[in-house]
Amino acid sequence: LDFFQDLFDYPYPYPKYEQAFVPEHNIGAMEKPGLVTFTEDFIFVSGATEDDLEGRANTICHEMAHMWFGDLVTMKWWDDLWLKESFADFMGALGAIEANGFNDAWVTFANRRKSWAYLQDQLPTTHPIVADIPHLEAAAQNFDGITYAKGASTLKQLVSYVGFDTFIEAARVYFKRFAWGNTSLQDF
């Protein structure tokens, strides 16, 4: 939490932060304001590899980043799901490196997440990162490699273009300006 509070120059927005492991949870992890639930697969009962530990750190940071990207500031409509998921995916890798010491997290990101985005982008179901979501049933289709990994890859490119400090300063302004509100691409 301290890493993101310092990075975003915005205090953790909830009275407490808890994590719960949910047996037979049907997805890896999910955040709610103040609580993240994880599948029991993240509890290592025997020799976890460095890759296992990095993956868990990345997931924890991804879900923790949602406390700002997604909960403190929420998208206006599902078209802008990327404002929540792409940023959390990017912050997962960043947090794995900066807060947890997994120095190869960007290499892992390139090998796994970015390649997932490339594969998803070749399918007939590909779509823009900012998608046209006409109704709620269509929203479920966008929890995919485009919204998560392609969006995060695009953010990584943006950081390379504008610089890390400029990017983070924009995020800080975004949180201060839109805290407890809803946004779209035009607001960012």
Model-derived features: where do they sit?
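Hydrophobic alpha-helical and helix-loop surface patches within well-folded domains
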Residues: 1-188
